[in-house]
């Protein structure tokens, strides 16, 4: 078996050839091709101009072409232009650095229109005498299913299954990151703690399905009123938090009031009975050392609102304590 194939399978970084064309004149290559056909990966060779000189049958099947028609074609012939940046950038990196490149490529093949993700390993092919990079050999593996599974697991680990908001773990992690940014950039940071009034009575009187409906409505309400650089999550039960970056406490209070009013106006029951919530609002203080400081104050403001008659919002003041 030719040295270049041995090196490619072992993943060695450098391949030296006198001429790429000799690969295809060698009668032994039919045996090598049998091995390439059974690898279950996409194998291809390109010259310095990005023109294909070889592709194994799996790659040809993806491109819906044959070995003869492939010759001289480039990635522009097989992938949509807006998907080529990752592919071409990796090729160029191989040509310029003379080093192997391992990266992920997200591409849509023109043949089937499907978005697939590939883990591509690209090795430079060097001229035996001059050491000039005269092409590359690539081995790509379709990892779409793995990436999708990874994303699903990430969602499961970070998302509340009922409301589809951040769960407690993800919420605290994002809150800590926002806290650090606010301290570093000396920007305001506000927190709204929200709790549905008498939620246990709703579950007891109307059932947990109705309670779930109320929670999901509130989650969608949050998503409809907060901007992209804010985030929210479910702390647990009927308690939620909204974190507003680069936002002063007065602006946060107005947002809390907007949420409270829209929630109170929604008729959850045929009897036209309404459900209410309370919110406590606080902001970053100069001496705060952790998100627990902000959260504690918003929680105190929340329970002051509940003590004062429910269905209201309260900003933390020193007198709140």
Swiss-Prot record:
Phenotype when changing residue 238 to K: 2-fold decrease in biofilm formation. 50% decrease in diguanylate cyclase activity. Does not affect the overall structure
Domain PAS: 28-98
PROSITE patterns: GGDEF (PS50887), PAC (PS50113), PAS (PS50112)
Keywords: GTP-binding, Magnesium, Metal-binding, Nucleotide-binding, Transferase
Active site: 238 (proton acceptor)
Substitution effect: residue 237 to R: 3-fold decrease in biofilm formation. 60% decrease in diguanylate cyclase activity. Does not affect the overall structure
UniProt-listed Enzyme Commission number(s): 2.7.7.65
Entry binding sites for Mg(2+): 195-196, 238
Domain GGDEF: 187-318
Recorded GO MF terms: diguanylate cyclase activity; GTP binding; metal ion binding
Top enzyme class: transferase
InterPro entries, per the entry: Diguanylate_Cyclase, GGDEF_dom, Nucleotide_cyclase, PAS, PAS-assoc_C, PAS-like_dom_sf, PAS_4, Rev_trsase/Diguanyl_cyclase
Any one Gene Ontology cellular component term annotated for this protein: plasma membrane
Domain PAC: 102-155
Catalytic activity annotation: 2 GTP = 3',3'-c-di-GMP + 2 diphosphate
Cofactor(s) needed by this chain: Mg(2+)
Cofactor binding, note field: Binds 1 Mg(2+) ion per monomer.
Any one GO biological process: cell adhesion involved in single-species biofilm formation
Job description of the protein: Involved in biofilm formation. Catalyzes the conversion of GTP to c-di-GMP.
The record's note on its domains: The disordered N-terminal region is not required for diguanylate cyclase activity.
Protein name: Diguanylate cyclase
Organism: Vibrio cholerae serotype O1 (strain ATCC 39541 / Classical Ogawa 395 / O395)
Source lineage: Bacteria, Pseudomonadati, Pseudomonadota, Gammaproteobacteria, Vibrionales
